[in-house]
Every structure is written in structure tokens, then in C-alpha cells.
Amino acid sequence: MHEHDSHGEAAHSNSEDMQMIHQHHEHHGHEEEHSAHHEKMKHSADHGDHHRMMMEDFKKRFYVSTLLTIPILILSPAIQTFLGFRVEFAGSLYILFLLSSAVYFYGGYPFLKGIFDELRRRQPGMMTLIAVAISVAYFYSSAVVFGLKGKFFFWELATLIDIMLLGHYIEMRSVLGASRALEELVKIMPSEAHLLKDGEIVEVKVENLKPGDKVLVKPGEKIPVDGIVVEGESFVNEAMLTGESKPVAKKPGDTVIGGAINGEGSLVVEVEKTGKDTYLNQVIELVRQAQESKSRTQDLANRAALLLTVIALTVGSVTLAIWLAYIADFAFAIERAVTVMVITCPHALGLAIPLVVAVSTSLAAKSGLLIRDRQAFERAKDLQAVIFDKTGTLTEGRFGVTDIVGFNHSEDELLQIAASLEARSEHPIAAAIVEEAEKRGFGLTEVEEFRAIPGKGVEGIVNGRRYMVVSPGYIRELGIKTDESVEKLKQQGKTVVFILKNGEVSGVIALADRIRPESREAISKLKAIGIKCMMLTGDNRFVAKWVAEELGLDDYFAEVLPHEKAEKVKEVQQKYVTAMVGDGVNDAPALAQADVGIAIGAGTDVAVETADIVLVRNDPRDVAAIVELSRKTYSKMKQNLLWATGYNAFAIPLAAGVLYSAGILLSPAVGAILMSLSTVIVAINARLLR
């Protein structure tokens, strides 16, 4: 939509359609300020600067044109008659003509240039209408100055251009907020880093860092790159990047994201990713692609805007002809035609959707919800069913204690004894029991004569008594019968360990893949908005049934092999518009098959090819957030399209003079004010999306 400078297409920080906002200008040349790998990140900032430069240009043209309009108003006979004074001297008419010419060519330049850009692309729109309207008024008035019979429209022309310039300036200010989110992401990144080299700290530009370098991050500083902590411990604030509200604890071996804010500890970070591979750059690229991708709704709005332009030009011409035939007053007929063209607002139609998209994709990105496919995001509003992969999505993918049953010991005693014995074991079950004891604040008791029983469990003396923590297989070997409560736990697919005291069963501890605390809230939120919740798992049916009952799922599919997941999704699709939620690795075909594929828990690796939407955090509640945002986005689009269509349907006949007999007639200046307001309303409504 623009003449592009050396930055090319990549310079766009928002939708191609967003360029309608400022299609009346060329890019100003930018200096290349960074090396190639840092360049894309700066493009959106450059584009924002360019947008601001254009705003300033409109403001400057508005001020100059307004100053020139003052003498035009004073010298205009119509204004003199209205205000009851007379200013006339030799050549005053020619001075009026020269001042009006200056306003037409200087103030009207963006619109005059815009018509050539639009016609060259064969996409007449807003600029075409304004340019035709001011040109008709200017050349007709000029002809009157040089002998044609009639009245001139110089003061109307000048005020019309002033209002158009001001309207576009206000509109661009309103719109800038939509495209500012990407610039904010870019601003997060620090420009310098403390490189550790030969035992010394060297200040270097971030773009000069390479994988393997080690950088020092001091307390309160922003982390300059994606990397791995090799020294130090701290809490890191990632809220601006992933939407994670609480600071995240970081220790050696943990990954950190460039742009996150370090807490009170110092960290030494080994550089892992630079340039376009960094998390932030990938997010910026995904948001840019989402904002530039077209959707059916947008195509419809674009066609409607083009059609509206043709209608306005046609109605303007017909209005001119009808009024000429009706009252044979050429000046009056010209004024009606000009008003029709300036009051029509294809801009409001053209911006109705891209503005909302720019706001919603940016809002989503800041919350760690990355939209890769805009059409899929729009489909999310129609979802009827969501299928979750179990392991790592609804559950944590690791053992946790779910039940403790004591026969002659309290739960707390049993847990403390079991944890004390298991503390020396590396087994995942042992780790889960110790973790549960720590969580409940129990200290470990000293164990004497500790011994591991290979493949069966552990034993030792605690508080003078011999205890064992053993598997069900060992219990069978001993010929010990278990009661109903134990059998019930087994039927739920849980792993059960027995605690024996002096050879007798004192109690059992049941463990299972731990259900995420957020899963219950996520499922209840989705069900509250009328969406059926289902689960796919390769796990056995007992485990699947237990998880489904715990979470209140509508249905579940157990013992499904990875290659069968896509088939199950297809089955559900026969009844419902379906989303699939998984980690994007072993369920890639299922994500691709679903109407909306959602990869969850992507962390810093956001380039999940098969997913339409990527959720950075491992939080199922974000699925409900995506559906809600999709519905709100669609609602805003509808509001904007309804407003833009309704406004034009009402304004065009009014401008043509259908209520002339009732004494209602709009001047071109009033038409221009209404047109500007209609676009600003669309922009403000889009920004109200939350």
C-alpha cells in the first residue's frame, strides 16, 4: 500500500490492511542502525517512528493550512456578509485565489498524492474521494475567479482541507495505540550486556554476542539474551513476555528469556539464542504474520470499502446531475456532490477489522497467547468441543501423592516415616513422597540399618521400629491380603505403595500423575461458556476415568496410540467444531486435524509448526482465555462493521440533500467533520478491547 523504502515488506509491524491508515505517504528513508540479525527486531520500531513522522507531517500541514485559512475567511464575501463587515481592495480576489491555491496544494498534498497511489493499485478509496471533492471545489472556484458565472468555494475548500488534516491526525493518534504493542516488545530489550571475558567484565552491544558467550546480569537489570543460568540464583519477572504474573525462581540449569527483569540476585547466563532465534523475535514475527494475514471477514470488508467508494463517486455524480436539473444552480449542485464525497467513509469500513486484529493479537501476545493463524483464531469463537491431551496438559506429567490411608497410624505419621525411608532413593515414586512431606512441612527422621530391596522397596529402623516401604508385588509374595480401600485406589489406576511395621501393613500411599491445580478452573470456565471438554490419553482406562471424574470432563478416550489421536479428533469433528490442545510434539497430527490446533506449554520454543495458536505457559486456563478473546474480538469486529455500514447508509443520502425540503442541508465542512468522527469512533472502539 506504500512506496517502500529499503526496509521493505518486513517493516510492517501490523496488518497490510492497517496501512490504509496512512496510505497517503511514502516511507521516509531510515538509516540502517544494527547488524542484520538484529534488524528485524528494529523494523517494527522503525515503522512506528515512520507512523509518528507522518502524524507530525499532518499536524504541521494542519497548522500551516489553518493559518492560511484565517485570511481566506476574512476575504470571502460569504463570510463578510454573514458577519456583517466588508474587506475589499484591488486584487483581493486574486489574493484569495493564491491563498486558497496554497492550501489546496500544500494542505491537500497527502490526498492528491493518495489518489495516484490508489488508482495505480486500482483500489480507489478514501484518498480518491477526498482528492476528487477538493479538486472539484478548487477548479470550479478558480474558473469563477477567471470569468465563469457562479460562486466560489474557497473558504469551504480551505476549512474542508483543515478538517480532513485534523481528522486524519486524530485518527492516526487513535490508531497508533494498536500498533504500539510490538514497539513496546522491542523496547524491552537492553542494547548492551556485561560480557565475561578472561575473568573481566566487558561492556558489549547485545547484537555482538554469540552462542556460548557468558554474560553477567546484575540485580534489577534486564536479561539481554535467551540463555541458560550457569551461576547464581534469583527471581526473574517475565510478566511482559509470557504473561506469568509471579516472578519465576531461576537457578543453574534453568533457561531465561531476553527482556525479562532480574530480581535481587546476580546471574551468569550462557548465551543460547541470538537474533531471529530468540523468543522475543519469534513472538514479534508471529504477531506480525497474524496481523498481516487475511481472513474472510477482512476480504469482505475490503470489497465493501471499494464498493462504497464507487457508490460515493456515482452518487456524487448523480447528485450533481439531479440538482442541476432540479434548480439549475451549478454552485449548489457542486456543493452537494462535494459533500457526498467527503461524508462517505470507506476508511471506517476498511479499518473496522484490521484495527481490532492489531489490538487483539498484541493483547494476546502480551499474555503469552500467540496467534499463528488468524482464521483459526476467528474459528475459536465457534468452538463446541475442546479435546485435551492428558499428560503434561491437564496433568503435570510427574508423580504426586494423591491419597494416604492409615490403618494404625495417622496420615502424617505414615508420610513422615515413608519420606524418611525414601529420602535416599532416586526413584520417581520416592521423590514424590519426599516432596509431599516437604510440602506439608515435615522434617525427616533419622533412619538406621537402611537397606534397599532391589525391585521391591526399602527398609530401615525408624524410632526403634523396623519399617518397610514396598510394592504391591512384594505384598503378594508375602501373601498379605489387602482391603477394599486399596483395591479402589488400584481401580483408579493409581500406583500404590505399602508401609509395613514389623511385617504388618500400617497403611498405603497412592500416587498418580498429578492433576494441575489450574485444570479444574479451566474445565469449569469452558463448560460455563457452553463448550464440551474431552480428554485423549495413551494411559490406561482406569487412570483416564479417574482424571475425567476429578475434572468433570464430558468424555474421555483412553489407551489411544499417538498415530490414532488424529482419528479420534476426526470422530469428534463429525459432531462438533473442535479444538485439540497438546504439547505439539507427539500429538502434531491431531493438532493439524482439529479445527483449531492449540500447542500448550511451548515455553521459549514458540515455532510449533502444526499449531494455529501457541500458548507459552503450561496453563489450561489460557485455552478458555483464547476462546473468550476470540468471541470479544468478533463482537468488536461486528460492532465496527455495523457502525461503518450504518453511518454511510445514513450519511450519504443526507449529504445528497434528501431532506432539503425539510430545511436540513449539510455543508462540506460538516460532512468532513462527520467523516473524521466516524473513523475515530471505529479506532477508539477497537482499543476498548480488553
Curated annotation (Swiss-Prot):
It is an enzyme of class 7 (translocase). GO terms for biological process: copper ion homeostasis. It is a multi-pass membrane protein. Keywords: ATP-binding, Cell membrane, Copper, Copper transport, Ion transport, Magnesium, Membrane, Metal-binding, Nucleotide-binding, Phosphoprotein, Translocase, Transmembrane, Transmembrane helix, Transport. Residues 28-46 have a biased composition (Basic and acidic residues). Residues 23-46 are annotated as: Disordered. The chain crosses the membrane at residues 65-85, 92-112, 128-148, 152-172, 304-324, 337-357, 641-661, 664-684. Optimum pH is 5.7. The keyword Transferase does not apply. It is found in: Cell membrane. Mg(2+) binds at D583, D587. Activated by Cu(2+) and to a lesser extent by Ag(+) and Cu(+). Residues 1-64, 113-127, 173-303, 358-640, 685-690 are cytoplasmic. Its EC number is 7.2.2.9. The active site is at D389. It catalyses: Cu(2+)(in) + ATP + H2O = Cu(2+)(out) + ADP + phosphate + H(+). Phosphate binds at K390, T391, T537, G538, K565. Pfam families: E1-E2_ATPase (PF00122), Hydrolase (PF00702). GO terms for cellular component: plasma membrane. Optimum temperature is 85 degrees Celsius. GO terms for molecular function: ATP binding; ATP hydrolysis activity; copper ion binding; P-type divalent copper transporter activity. Residues 86-91, 149-151, 325-336, 662-663 are extracellular. Belongs to the cation transport ATPase (P-type) (TC 3.A.3) family. Type IB subfamily. The histidine-N-terminal metal-binding domain (His-N-MBD) seems to have a regulatory role affecting the metal transport rate by controlling the metal release/dephosphorylation rates. Involved in copper export. This is Copper-exporting P-type ATPase B. It comes from Archaeoglobus fulgidus (strain ATCC 49558 / DSM 4304 / JCM 9628 / NBRC 100126 / VC-16). The gene is copB.
